[in-house]
Swiss-Prot record:
EC number, as in UniProt: 2.1.1.228
NCBIfam families: PRK00026.1 (NF000648), trmD (TIGR00088)
Native species: Flavobacterium johnsoniae (strain ATCC 17061 / DSM 2064 / JCM 8514 / BCRC 14874 / CCUG 350202 / NBRC 14942 / NCIMB 11054 / UW101)
Primary localization class, coarse: cytoplasm
Record keyword DNA repair present: no
Protein name per Swiss-Prot or TrEMBL: tRNA (guanine-N(1)-)-methyltransferase
């Protein structure tokens, strides 16, 4: 997978890709991540990427020209499965969406900033708008990181134990149930006996039941889709 991230703050994005799972994926050659500074595509001497709103109003708007030039340049080099705009009014990211998108070869993620982007960008360039929740951030960069992490960890070969991703919360519209590690008895707080029984079928049944109960208590809405 190749991820091209368009941003005005590339320095905000670099370090998360230099650690943990995302770094491992890049080192293995399973993922390429490229950052594109919008200021490199401006045509004005000030390297500004924003301007005042037509009709007045609070907040600056990201201009269409540098975004157009950047996206057009990238599209001239390869085809993209999706051109994504991180937006609070986009479709809320979920595991089903991540599963599908993790199979893409090339995506562009545009990070909004200021008040947002010129509507013509959304009308003519963007193929999908994604939100990470019902709240507003200072820019789309953190959302782009969340999306990237959600996709990258699902790519075959990234996780040392690929079955780990298959048992994550939301994979079957269920939350993960309780998990434990050693010691089996700590201050009298004991791990459920079934988990130390060595009986694979009973352990699997316990985990399924525990996941269902946990979901019923925390996110009953998910069971409507289960």
């Amino acid at each position: 997978m190749r991820i091209d991230i368009i941003t005005v703050l590339p320095e905000l994005l670099r370090s998360p890709f230099e650690a943990s799972i995302m770094k491992r994926a890049i080192d293995k050659g399973l993922v390429e991540v490229h950052f594109h500074n919008l200021r490199d595509y401006t045509t004005n001497k000030q390297k500004s990427v924003d301007d005042y709103q037509f009709g007045g109003g609070a907040g600056m708007v990201m201009m269409i020209q540098p975004i157009d030039d950047c996206i057009t340049h990238l599209k001239s080099e390869r085809e993209y499965d999706e051109i994504i705009y991180m937006s609070p009014d986009g479709e809320t990211l979920n595991q089903k969406m991540a599963n599908k998108m993790s199979m893409y070869e090339n995506i562009i993620i545009l990070c909004g900033h200021y008040k947002g982007v010129d509507q013509r960008v959304r009308d003519h360039f963007i193929t999908k708008e994604i939100s990470i929740g019902d709240y507003v951030l200072s820019g789309g960069e953190l959302g782009a990181l969340v999306l990237s992490d959600a996709l990258i960890r699902l790519i075959p070969g990234v996780l040392s134990d690929e079955t780990s991703a298959l048992t994550d919360s939301f994979q079957d519209n269920l939350l993960s149930g309780p998990i434990y590690t050693r010691p089996a008895d700590y201050k009298g707080w004991k791990v459920p006996e079934v988990l130390t029984s060595g009986h694979a079928a009973k352990i699997e049944k316990w985990r399924e039941d525990a996941a269902y109960e946990h979901t019923k208590n925390r996110r009953p809405d998910l069971l409507e889709e289960h």
